[in-house]
A protein has these predicted regions:
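Conserved catalytic cores of phosphodiester-cleaving nucleases, focusing on short active-site segments
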Residues: 23, 42-63, 79
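Hydrophobic "anchor" residues on beta-strands that sit immediately upstream
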Residues: 29, 52, 96
């Protein structure tokens, strides 16, 4: 592993810790971290009241595209596939769900609620 990749992973892991703390401060229940499904990975899964929230965490150390902008349509589809997998596995089909992005750049943490709509087949 080269230094940039290692630094990026450490930065991403620290960002996920900060994002989780933000959600806990907002009284969300954390259900899963780094959930892996076939062809998908979801950084955080939380519950906000009755809503299941699938969260993509984007940590930026340099300026450039915002976290929301860097969650491409393909990435959204993968997150949605992972969300369906999680909900089926845990008997949550039919529950309300949403997709949030948490952007972290320096000391600024921005929680974008409903950052993108469901991208995939209707189940």
């Amino acid at each position: 592993m080269d230094r940039d990749t290692g630094a990026s992973r450490r930065s991403g892991a620290l960002g996920e810790v900060r994002a989780e703390q933000l959600l806990r401060d907002k009284e969300y229940d954390i259900l899963a971290h780094n959930y892996v499904a076939p062809g998908a990975e979801i950084d955080l899964i939380a519950q906000d009241g009755a809503v299941i929230v699938f969260v993509e965490v984007k940590t930026r150390t340099k300026s450039g595209a915002s976290g929301r902008e860097s969650v491409t349509r393909e990435k959204q589809r993968r997150i949605c596939r992972g969300a369906i997998h999680y909900m089926m596995k845990h008997g949550l089909m039919g529950r309300q769900a949403r997709f949030d992005v948490i952007e972290i750049q320096g000391t600024r943490v921005t929680h974008i609620v409903n950052a993108f709509p469901y991208q995939g087949p209707m189940v």
